[in-house]
From Swiss-Prot:
Protein name from the UniProt record: 26S proteasome non-ATPase regulatory subunit 1
Residue(s) carrying N-acetylmethionine: 1
Any single Pfam family the record assigns to this protein: RPN2_C
Keyword terms: Acetylation, Phosphoprotein, Proteasome, Repeat
PTM sites of type Phosphothreonine: 273, 311, 830
Family: Belongs to the proteasome subunit S1 family.
Organism of derivation: Rattus norvegicus
Cellular component GO terms held in the UniProt record: nucleus; proteasome accessory complex; proteasome complex; proteasome regulatory particle, base subcomplex; proteasome storage granule
Subunit field text: Component of the 19S proteasome regulatory particle complex. The 26S proteasome consists of a 20S core particle (CP) and two 19S regulatory subunits (RP). The regulatory particle is made of a lid composed of 9 subunits, a base containing 6 ATPases and few additional components including PSMD1. Interacts with ADRM1. Interacts with ZFAND1.
UniProt feature, compositional bias: Acidic residues: 936-953
PC repeats: 403-436, 441-474, 476-510, 511-545, 547-580, 581-616, 617-649, 651-685, 686-726, 729-761
UniProt modified residues of type N6-acetyllysine: 310, 720
Role of this protein: Component of the 26S proteasome, a multiprotein complex involved in the ATP-dependent degradation of ubiquitinated proteins. This complex plays a key role in the maintenance of protein homeostasis by removing misfolded or damaged proteins, which could impair cellular functions, and by removing proteins whose functions are no longer required. Therefore, the proteasome participates in numerous cellular processes, including cell cycle progression, apoptosis, or DNA damage repair.
Length: 953
């Protein structure tokens, strides 16, 4: 056994090259044990490597590389490893090889990324030896079938050639494509490179044996290529693949922005007429159509004509198909279907609300109960609780009346066709002036009903705001108009809101400032930013500043690094409200990106700013940036949740609620649990609301602590000595937990992984309830129905069943509260003589002996009963439209005997077009009527009796 390498090292001083080679081979064998000793003579080994006449100079490089590796000098080690050429074996599994390969990839990645940002002429040459090792690494991944690893390295090193090759060579091309698309959506922060990757994905998807148009359109949404989407839709219509076109339209509505959809609709309108007038026209933009277009068009016309009950000769069907697609893209269809689902499946437990109503004793809790009721009935159109408690509701005065009236907008969310009729009694009238609070609330409610889908109601709200003379009505009108015209960037709407802002009225200005942001959402409009920031720096009203703080952030929604200059200037402002606006701007610009720079900035402000509101906003904003990876959030905010500053603790609670909304994340709940007993009441409020956001729609099986928290909410509400702030949080939490009749969840991203703009906006404005309770209603924008709705070729709901392959109790509705039984009046105890007591004692002993004899029989009977109790089945059949929770989608399938085939996997959920494989007549689901006030129809007179002959006896 060798105890020293001194003898081998001495051979390096010999003249004979063969002795030196022998020494290097021996040193290579013992370098891991004697590297410290060899390091003293490493210069001799370096000299051998530099001697170009030395035959084994590559071996010298390998030994030197290993010595430097042990010394921790990884850069030198990498340089010598590159010099070792093929002697550096990338397939070796030693720690040395793994480390050097990692360093090699890091170094190569850094050079590739730097080159990507430089113009073509200024790019630095990359060491061919470095590229050689990386290429060997790629080959090793492919040989070992580690395709995901290869894709990851290819994307990091910007090697699109390897990226494409890896996907095509993998044994699961659709799986690799889905994985790559997911990476693009969630992890890529460089927009330019992401677009290049998406173009490659589009090419691969289109070149598949059966092109995957659904995923192509998902890529095109990211690329903001509306023309290509329009071309695909036209191509599908012409190829008689109308059902696929409908499915893509539904997916587009769910994932794309309003501007994108408007552009696609515009493109369809411009090509609609030529398609209709010339069947089989090849005018399809950039997507070439097959030769048999005219035949396919004819068959489509015949089938469509039969559906509409018209003769095929008339042939206006293609235009009719385009109109249907436009109806889907505009959102009209999805909103109607979701409304039907929520009305049909409403499962609200009114007992919870009744108990809360009976327990509340002040106006703040009264308002909270009204808000909770609207959350519980969001989109169900059921105002049963309010109708049953009109006298109690009438206690709401002033701004509480405004909030209560606006809550009807949440209850009737999406009930657009009859919105004006429903709200008629609360809206401003020409004849007699009503309550300003009621009228303002009514206009706000109209905005909530039409949120992000304004249409004709925008002009109505515009006129009402123009004619409003009262600041309260203007407040409600501004909020309503902002919601209805969200993201439209309409100049006339912007100008009117700006006029209202410049009146320098605190109440009007607060709503107008926020509404400006809603209208210009994500537009990055320079003029809007200048107007808003300029006015914010001038005004003396804190309320106006608060509205503008959020409004400014909304203008920069999704703009990422384009918002950096504005963020810098806001963060340096001496006004704490504008610094807070800077935090919200970071949250909106980088929402869902997981951007490290943004996270670092927020964490820095969270511990360094002198203003509590700014620190709280900074921590809250972390939730918006991390929501794509909710499992990361608890570790990021865990220390902040134990901060000495209660505002930071509150912010940490809300960040967890926002980031982990609807996930039932156990780590997040474990962090929130101690915060529900915090000595500061508003921290408890935040923890209670955040816990409900996380546990919305969770059952005891999916999240064991849900019932424990339900009891906690009830305990806080019923405790007379508890603080109003905590009670407000508990009441709101009850409403959130059971939202939409137990049929909605909260998610900041769409089912396909795109950031869901209305949800992000809704949650951000909801967090402003800290300053202004009526803004709580904005949370309704984030409620997403957890449904699967199957549609046939006529876009009607057929009667069909889905099979959920798990026990019904796993995702069941929570059991309703039991109605408490009336207690019998206690009888006054009478005096008992000692003799009577002794006699009774003897009787009891006799009875006890008899009972013991009976026990055996009773035990046998109990066992029989237990045997009779049937075990729970392992599956459940759900009727269309079905309530299916996100976790349940994985175990969902069509029944074996089903006549329908879905156009995309059921595991995605949402609205799915079904292909009918049978010729039989379809059974359709009957639509249900919405609740709410109706115009009384005149009763029809009874028909006169049939003629008869009267015979006198």
């Amino acid at each position: 056994m060798i105890t020293s390498a001194a003898g081998i090292i001495s051979l390096l001083d010999e003249e004979e090259p063969q002795l030196k080679e022998f020494a290097l081979h021996k040193l290579n064998a013992v370098v891991n044990d004697f590297w410290a000793e060899i390091s003293e003579s490493v210069d001799k080994i370096e000299v051998l490597y530099e001697d170009e006449g030395f035959r084994s100079r590559q071996f010298a490089a390998l030994v030197a590389s290993k010595v430097f590796y042990h010394l921790g000098a990884f850069e030198e080690s990498l340089n010598y490893a590159l010099g070792a050429g093929d002697l550096f074996n990338v397939n070796d599994n030693s720690e040395y090889v793994e480390t050097i390969i990692a360093k090699c990839i890091d170094h190569y990645t850094k050079q590739c990324v730097e080159n990507a940002d430089l113009p073509e002429g200024e790019k630095k040459p990359i060491d061919q030896r470095l590229e050689g090792i990386v290429n060997k690494m790629f080959q090793r991944c492919l040989d070992d079938h580690k395709y995901k690893q290869a894709i990851g390295i290819a994307l990091e090193t910007r090697r699109l050639d390897v990226f494409e090759k890896t996907i095509l060579e993998s044994n699961d091309v659709p799986g690799m494509l889905a994985y790559s698309l997911k990476l693009c959506m969630s992890l890529m922060q460089n927009k330019q490179f992401r677009n290049k990757v998406l173009r490659v994905l589009v090419k691969i998807y289109m070149n598949l044996e059966k092109p995957d148009f659904i995923n192509v359109c998902q890529c095109l949404i990211f690329l903001d290529d509306t023309q290509a989407v329009s071309d695909i839709l036209e191509k599908l219509v012409k190829e008689d693949n109308l059902l696929m076109a409908y499915q893509i339209c539904f997916d587009l509505y769910e994932s794309a922005s309003q501007q994108f959809l408007s552009s696609v609709i515009q493109n369809l309108r411009t090509v609609g007429t030529p398609i209709a007038s010339v069947p089989g026209s090849t005018n399809t933009g950039t997507v070439p159509g097959p030769e048999k277009d005219s035949d396919s068009m004819e068959t489509e016309e015949k089938t469509a004509g039969a559906v509409a009950g018209k003769t095929p000769d008339a042939s206006p069907e293609p235009k009719d198909q385009t109109l249907k697609m436009i109806k889907i893209l505009s959102g009209e269809m999805a909103i109607e279907l979701h409304l039907q689902f929520l009305i049909r499946n409403n499962n609200t437990d009114l007992m919870i609300l009744k108990n809360t109503k009976d327990a509340v004793r002040n106006s703040v809790c009264h308002t909270a109960t009204v808000i909770a009721n609207s959350f519980m009935h969001c989109g169900t159109t059921s105002d049963q609780f309010l109708r049953d408690n009109l006298e109690w509701l009438a206690r709401a005065t002033n701004w509480a009346k405004f909030t209560a009236t606006a809550s009807l907008g949440v209850i009737h969310k999406g009930h657009e066709k009859e919105a004006l009729q429903l709200m008629a009694t609360y809206l401003p009238k020409d004849t007699s002036p009503g309550s300003a609070y009621q009228e303002g609330g009514g206009l706000y409610a109209l905005g909530l009903i039409h949120a992000n889908h304004g249409g004709d109601i925008i002009d109505y709200l515009l006129n009402q705001l123009k004619n409003a003379s009262n600041d309260i009505v203007r407040h409600g009108g501004s909020l309503g108009l902002g919601l209805a015209a969200m993201g439209t960037a309409r100049q006339d709407v912007y100008d009117l809101l700006k006029t209202n802002l410049y009146q320098d009225d605190a109440v009007t200005g607060e709503a107008a400032g926020l509404a400006l942001g809603l209208v210009m959402l994500g537009s990055k409009n320079t003029q809007a930013i200048e107007d808003m920031v300029g006015y914010a720096q001038e005004t003396q009203h804190e309320k106006i500043l608060r509205g503008l703080a959020v409004g400014i952030a909304l203008v920069m929604y999704g703009r990422m690094e384009e918002a950096d200059a504005l963020i810098e200037s806001l963060c340096r402002d001496k006004d704490p409200i504008l610094r807070r606006s800077g935090m919200y701007t970071v949250a909106m610009a980088y929402c869902g990106s997981g951007n490290n720079k943004a996270i670092r900035r927020l964490l820095h402000v969270a511990v360094s700013d002198v203003n509590d509101d700014v620190r709280r906003a900074a921590v809250e904003s972390l939730g918006f940036i991390l929501f794509r990876t909710p499992e990361q959030c608890p570790s990021v905010v865990s220390l902040l949740s134990e901060s000495y500053n209660p505002h930071v603790r509150y912010g940490a609670a809300m960040a967890l609620g926002v980031c982990c909304a609807g996930t039932g994340n156990k780590e997040a709940i474990n962090l929130l649990e101690p915060m529900t007993n915090d000595p500061v009441n508003y921290v408890r409020q935040g923890a209670l609301i955040a816990s409900a956001l996380i546990m919305i729609q969770q059952t005891e099986i999916t999240c064991p602590k849900v019932n424990q928290f339900r009891q906690l909410y009830s305990k806080v509400i019923n405790d007379k000595h508890d603080d109003v702030m905590a009670k407000f949080g508990a009441i709101l939490a009850q409403g959130i937990l059971d939202a939409g009749g137990h049929n909605v969840t909260i998610s900041l991203q769409s089912r396909t992984g795109h950031t869901h703009m209305p949800s992000v906006v809704g949650v951000l404005v909801f967090t402003q309830f800290w300053f202004w309770f009526p803004l709580s209603h904005f949370l309704s924008l984030a409620y997403t129905p957890t449904c699967i709705i199957g549609l046939n070729k006529d876009l009607k709901m057929p009667k069909v069943q889905y099979k959920s392959n798990c026990k019904p109790s796993t995702f069941a509705y929570p059991a309703p509260l039991e109605v408490p039984k009336e207690k019998e009046k206690e009888k006054v105890s009478t005096a008992v003589l000692s003799i009577t007591a002794k006699a009774k004692k003897k009787e009891k002993e006799k009875e006890k002996k008899e009972e013991e004899k009976m026990e055996v029989d009773e035990a046998e009977k109990k066992e029989e009963k237990e045997k009779k109790k049937e075990p729970e089945p392992n599956f459940q059949l759900l009727d269309n439209p079905a309530r299916v929770m996100p976790a349940q989608l994985k175990v969902l399938s069509m029944t074996e005997t089903c006549r329908y085939q879905p156009f995309k996997p059921l595991s995605i959920g949402g609205i799915i077009i079904l292909k009918d494989t049978s010729e039989d007549i379809e059974e359709l689901v009957e639509p249900v009527a919405a609740h709410g006030p109706k115009i009384e129809e005149e009763e029809q007179e009874p028909e006169p009796p049939e003629p008869f002959e009267y015979i006198d006896d």
